[in-house]
Amino acid sequence: MSHIIPYQILGCVNVRLAKFTAGTDVDEYHLTLCIDDKACHMSYAEQLRQLCAAFEIVRQQIKASPVFKRYFISDAANQTAMLMNYELTSPDYELSVIEQPPANGTQVALWCYLMTHINTKANTFGLYEVEHGSYRHLWSANNTAQAKTCSAQTKLLLNDYVMQLMNEGCTLRDNCVRTWFYVNDIDRDYKDMVKARNDVFYTQGMNRHTHFTVSTGIGSRQADNQIRCQMDSYAVCGLRQGQMRYLHAPEYLCPTADGMSFERGACIDYGDRRHVFISGTGSTDRNDDVVSQGDILGQCMRVWQNIEALLNEADCEMNDLQVLTCAIRDASDFHVVRQFLQKKTEHRIPYVLVNAHICKPGRLVEMECIAARKAKSSYPNF
């Protein structure tokens, strides 16, 4: 079951923490740290210092090990080096750094996924492994490739990932749960990225007759201005046939059979719990048309309905959400969207609200999330 740790402020850092426990060995935590509006005047160095100090306080309080961190920063070219000074001494979790500015005008935010009673290590072939029980969870982040076009970079990234998975005894088709593609110029290169992704998928037996992966494709710059695309990923080694299934909500969203090249969501059943991963979700209908064109609040409401429909298909509810990332295309929509999220979450769900270009111009807001629910099945425990 989920336990929401009381919302707190440490220095200038707003802390939101959700704990999930199934009463078995591994407890899970999702933590978001965001700089308070009142600290906008502080330097990046001071915001980062206070955020990292707050993280360490919370980590010691909950006595859990970080598995995956994602920093959202406002200027990757000038801020990444200082951030890495805090992170280079901690090699036992995966680290993602993306330029998606916190939407409240501050300069850095953090989402971190933590667990108890696990073993973590960096594997020889470049993936970070989290091992417990019958499973090995394989995380990868900040992957980039040297090529002239976004399409070529995407193919190189995915082909390299296919080989990394093969070296771990896994495949893209059977073990990859989720990918994130952060595209420098999403308005120009999104279609090329998608086509390149599909080209690699097809070589791995992934198509509209089989399945794709849960995914987010969204705008973000990297510290190196030659990088057109960055890829993060998550896979699970040890899954049995049928243990992961895909979510469609066809009455609300356009299905893969009609041309979508990513899964709207996926759920994985373990012996003691169910995990649900929801792709970046916009305000669209079953024909992939934008709902509430030009209306940010209307689009927020439709996104929420779409996510709820996907969760319901997995026999889950909005109360099962563990963490949510919300991106808005126009920073001036910040106050409306934050008020919407505050009303919907009531501080129950850790979230990060950032400013980023979304894959198609008419889509003003996009949300992705992770949910968990206590459940029993014949599969080994998480």
Kindly give the residue locations of the regions a language model identified.
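N-terminal presequence-like segments and the immediate start of the first folded domain
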Residues: 1-322, 328-382
